[in-house]
């Protein structure tokens, strides 16, 4: 029973870490990354459709994304969706390909992005700590129902804390990498 609680806690902490990585990958650095356009929705037959379903996005070079639209009739809709997104991008089309040059980040914008990254990181840490709290509550419930002894409870809580410390450290590493990426480019 305790092993299942620990495994469940570790799995949930891993999911929290992956979610954090996903959120942070959408924050623009100076480098062109196709994931930057993942959140863009394009109006397609009256429905908002993810850009990824309508086009292929690749990094052409360090500062340019190339969006190859599958259906020529959608080029203007895709261009408009990129232009009206809050990413501050200015696309230009050439045939079925839309080129999206990424403007260089200003020092002020880099600092703002680092604040956003730190905020996301704090949310990631809170998620990991919430998983720890849930696991500890389950362990205490087992103690209350007299399914485990106090020694087993303390040992299990220590192991949960060790797992938590590992994931908090991983969150810090992800944040440090993203901050370095933002400041280096």
UniProtKB/Swiss-Prot annotation:
Q: Name one GO cellular component term.
A: cytosol
Entry's localization field: Cytoplasm
**Alphabetical UniProt keywords:** Cytoplasm, Protein biosynthesis
GO MF annotation terms: ribosomal large subunit binding
What Gene3D superfamilies has UniProt attached to this entry? 3.30.1360.40, Ribosome-recycling factor
Q: Which residues form the signal peptide?
A: none
What is an annotated GO biological process for this record, any one?
translation
Q: Say yes or no: keyword Cytoplasm present.
A: yes
Recorded family membership: Belongs to the RRF family.
Q: What does this protein do?
A: Responsible for the release of ribosomes from messenger RNA at the termination of protein biosynthesis. May increase the efficiency of translation by recycling ribosomes from one round of translation to another.
Write the protein's name. Answer: Ribosome-recycling factor
Name of the gene this protein is made from: frr
């Amino acid at each position: 029973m305790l092993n299942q609680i620990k495994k469940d806690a570790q799995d949930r902490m891993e999911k929290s870490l992956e979610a954090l990585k996903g959120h942070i990958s959408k924050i623009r650095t100076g480098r062109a990354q196709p994931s930057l356009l993942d959140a863009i929705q394009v109006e397609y037959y009256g429905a908002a459709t993810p850009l990824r379903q309508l086009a292929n996005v690749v990094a052409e070079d360090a500062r340019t994304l190339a969006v190859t639209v599958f259906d020529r009739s959608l080029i203007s809709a895709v261009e408009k969706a990129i232009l009206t997104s809050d990413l501050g991008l200015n696309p230009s089309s050439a045939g079925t390909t839309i080129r999206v040059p990424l403007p260089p980040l200003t020092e002020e914008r880099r600092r703002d992005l680092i604040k956003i990254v730190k905020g996301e990181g704090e949310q990631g840490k809170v998620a990991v700590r919430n998983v720890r709290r849930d696991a500890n509550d389950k362990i205490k419930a087992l103690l209350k129902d007299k399914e485990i002894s106090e020694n087993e409870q303390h040992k299990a809580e220590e192991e949960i804390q060790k797992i938590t410390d590992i994931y908090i450290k991983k969150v810090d590493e992800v944040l440090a990498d993203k901050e370095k990426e933002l400041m280096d480019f």
